[in-house]
Curated annotation (Swiss-Prot):
<feature type="glycosylation site" description="N-linked (GlcNAc...) asparagine; by host">
    <location>
        <position position="143"/>
    </location>
</feature>
<keyword id="KW-1168">Fusion of virus membrane with host membrane</keyword>
<feature type="compositionally biased region" description="Basic residues">
    <location>
        <begin position="20"/>
        <end position="37"/>
    </location>
</feature>
<dbReference type="GO" id="GO:0020002">
    <property type="term" value="C:host cell plasma membrane"/>
</dbReference>
<feature type="signal peptide">
    <location>
        <begin position="1"/>
        <end position="98"/>
    </location>
</feature>
<keyword id="KW-1160">Virus entry into host cell</keyword>
<keyword id="KW-0261">Viral envelope protein</keyword>
<dbReference type="GO" id="GO:0019031">
    <property type="term" value="C:viral envelope"/>
</dbReference>
<keyword id="KW-1032">Host cell membrane</keyword>
<keyword id="KW-1043">Host membrane</keyword>
<keyword id="KW-0945">Host-virus interaction</keyword>
<feature type="region of interest" description="Immunosuppression">
    <location>
        <begin position="463"/>
        <end position="481"/>
    </location>
</feature>
<keyword id="KW-0165">Cleavage on pair of basic residues</keyword>
<keyword id="KW-0472">Membrane</keyword>
<keyword id="KW-1162">Viral penetration into host cytoplasm</keyword>
<keyword id="KW-0325">Glycoprotein</keyword>
<feature type="region of interest" description="Fusion peptide">
    <location>
        <begin position="457"/>
        <end position="477"/>
    </location>
</feature>
Length: 688
């Protein structure tokens, strides 16, 4: 009987059979993977890409309609140029979302309404100082704009005076009033050269009316400022008479504090006081008639009460504003805000009517009055002026109004609102993704220090060409984004630069060397404001990239409601509820500027820069390249030795398997039962 072969041929051949059985499964998996790749490549093609809508004529018509609506709202005449500018405003870039900071914008190209509560004096120059007093108008520069639409806000009731019979809400009505004063006749035979007779001067002047429901005589006990003394104490009879019968009376800067006339604005709270009436409650006509012979048979006006007759001269009607107190009984302790020269502006709205002593006819005197920089006059029809109080703020709007700096009798049918160019505003601007810095040199050092770190430089080399391309691409994208996001701050900077240069050139042309004292005073006042702006600029740390505005280090909270900023730009300065308290913002900016000065360590920055430059020395890089070379050599050696070690390990495992087979045969046969020649060699598995 032939002997069976040693071992188990079925079991030993299972290793090969199992491998053959697994191949169909691997092929199926590979096939499925190929199908999935094809499907994945088809999915992007199946995505529907929206077709970009082409610009059609209907779109252009819609844009033109929006631009025409902008011109209509702003009351701007429609021309090809204005329509093009309106289209640019409609097609303006979207708002940017970079870093926002508060910017200090000196002398901005905007106008704010002036309230009666403003303590800044409004200076008025006239061409008839002989009959109106004050300072002469040597300018002769009278400017009038076209129709504009004005919108503003004020903390207090705006200064609004109506020269028409119709009065807008919040405005005061004016009327003709009679001012009388008498001067002595000349008699050289008498002591002092004064005769026994008196000469009466009669002047009809437009001022606040003293009749009607909005006028009340209220005794007042409050003391006026020392600048306004009692007329009967400060100016005696004939104190300014110089012996010239043709010289009109002088205007006296005094008051009668024991009597006062109050005027109320139409439909609004607050009072305007006038202490220039010597006898507000008694008509002085009867007293003058009783002394008719003394005044050369002078007869007072008929059907017109006389309350402003004073022997020493004409008393200037200084107006004092009083806010309505919360407690009606606390009126005597409410502060009064004086307005000393506004009466001259009102007087110029109509001709002066003068009756000289000894004349029967009245003389019409045309008059003009101008406000000085930075004030202007907004003229408009009463029905087109709207003053509305919302909460604690007055909203002012005027349609088809004109801006001017002077008034004359042509304004008799209009109402006037005083506006002012503010010395500065705080405007939030966007500077993009770049950091805020006030010194370009220091910022350059910082940039260089960040870029020359040795470890980052070596890491960039190891990354390879693809990584370098990605880094360059990211820098290019960041630069493009930075340029786009800086549009807001750049626009404000360029706008203010253009306005500043234009106004400076115009001012140089207008202000001639032969300007009189008043023009020189205006220049000095404006230079004083420029010095104040420069002082603020020098004490505040500003962004180095913007020269015509000061981008402060105070961040702007972009989540704030823009209406608060808009209210500030329209005229609200000190109201935390609806706007910002500008004084508090200014203090915060000053504190941050001081902290920023202390935070800059120039010595530390220089040392850091020196260390960074030292790290870029090629001799110092040798150690890094040595380490890299040693590491690469070790890696090559390991890769070369690994196949040899793996082959030796496979042979060892093969020998161990052979020894195990021999031991199994010995156990089955009970020793060395089979000769070596008859032993069947078992199939071996190759590990190589």
């Amino acid at each position: 009987m032939p002997k069976h072969q040693s071992g188990s041929p079925t079991d030993s051949s299972d290793l090969l059979l199992s491998g053959k059985k697994q191949r169909p499964h691997l092929a199926l998996r590979r096939k499925r993977r190929r199908e999935m790749r094809k499907i994945n490549r088809k999915v992007p093609r199946m995505n529907l890409v929206p077709i970009k809508e082409k610009t059609a004529w209907q779109h252009l018509q819609a844009l033109i309609s929006e631009a025409e609506e902008v011109l209509k709202t702003s009351q701007t005449p429609q021309t090809s140029l204005t329509l093009f500018l309106a289209l640019l405003s409609v097609l303006g870039p979207p708002p940017v979302t970079g870093e926002s900071y508060w910017a200090y914008l000196p002398k901005p190209p905007i106008l704010h309404p002036v309230g009666w509560g403003s303590t800044d004096p409004i200076r008025v120059l006239t061409n008839q100082t002989m009959y109106l007093g004050g300072s002469p108008d040597f300018h002769g520069f009278r400017n009038m704009s076209g129709n504009v639409h004005f919108e503003g806000k004020s903390d207090t009731l705006p200064i609004c005076l109506s020269f028409s019979f119709s009065t807008p809400t919040g405005c005061f009505q004016v009327d003709k009033q009679v001012f009388l004063s008498d001067t002595p006749t000349v008699d050289n035979n008498k002591p002092g050269g004064k005769g026994d007779k008196r000469r009466m001067w009669e002047l009809w002047l437009t001022t606040l009316g003293n009749s009607g429901a909005n006028t009340k005589l209220v005794p007042i006990k409050k003391k006026l400022p020392p600048k306004y003394p009692h007329c009967q104490i400060a100016f005696k009879k004939d104190a300014f008479w110089e012996g010239d019968e043709s010289a009109p009376p002088r205007w006296l800067p005094c008051a009668f504090p024991d009597q006062g006339v109050s005027f109320s604005p139409k439909g609004a709270l607050g009072l305007l006081w006038d202490f220039s009436l010597p006898s507000p409650s008694v008509d002085q006509s009867d007293q003058i008639k009783s002394k008719k012979n003394l005044f050369g048979n002078y007869t007072p006006p008929v059907n017109k009460e006389v309350h402003r007759w004073y022997e020493a001269g004409w008393v200037e009607p200084t107006w004092f504003w009083e806010n309505s107190p919360k407690d009606p009984n606390d009126r005597d302790f409410t502060a009064l805000v004086p307005h000393t020269e506004l009466f001259r502006l009102v007087a110029a709205s109509r001709h002066l009517i003068l009756k000289r002593p000894g004349f029967q006819e009245h003389e019409m005197i045309p008059t003009s009055a101008c406000v000085t920089y930075p004030y202007a006059i907004l003229l408009g029809l009463p029905q087109l002026i709207d003053i509305e109080k919302r909460g604690s703020t007055f909203h002012i709007s005027c349609s088809s109004c004109r801006l001017t700096n002077c008034l004359d009798s042509s304004a008799y049918d209009y109402a006037a609102i005083i506006v002012k160019r503010p010395p500065y505003v705080l405007l939030p601007v966007d500077i993009g993704d770049e950091p805020w810095f006030d010194d370009s040199a220091i910022q350059t050092f910082r940039y260089a220090t960040d870029l020359i770190r040795a470890k980052r430089f070596v890491a960039a080399i190891i990354l390879g060409i693809s990584a370098l391309i990605a880094i360059i691409t990211s820098f290019a994208v960041a630069t493009t984004a930075l340029v786009k996001e800086m549009q807001t701050a750049t626009f404000v900077n360029n706008l203010h630069r253009n306005v500043t240069l234009a106004l400076s050139e115009q001012r140089i042309i207008d202000l001639k060397l032969e300007a009189r004292l008043n023009a020189l005073e205006e220049v000095v006042l404006e230079l004083g404001q420029d010095v104040a702006n420069l002082k603020t600029r020098m004490s505040t740390r500003c962004h180095a990239n913007y020269d015509f505005i000061c981008v402060t280090p105070l961040p702007y909270n972009a989540t704030e409601n823009w209406e608060r900023t808009r209210a500030h730009l329209l005229g609200i300065w000190n109201d935390n509820e609806i706007s910002y308290n500008i004084q508090e913002l200014t203090n915060l900016i000053s504190d941050m500027s001081k902290q920023h000065i202390d935070a800059v360590d120039l010595s530390g920055l220089a040392q850091s820069f020196a260390n960074g430059v030292k790290a870029l020395n090629p001799l110092d890089w040798t150690q890094y390249f040595i380490f890299i070379g040693v590491g690469a050599l070790l890696l090559v050696i390991v890769l070369m030795i690994f196949p040899i070690v793996f082959q030796c390990l496979a042979k060892s495992l093969d020998q161990v398997q052979s020894d195990l087979n021999v031991l199994l045969l010995k156990k089955k046969k009970g020793g060395n039962a089979a000769p070596a020649a008859e032993m069947v060699e078992l199939p071996r598995v190759s590990y190589t």
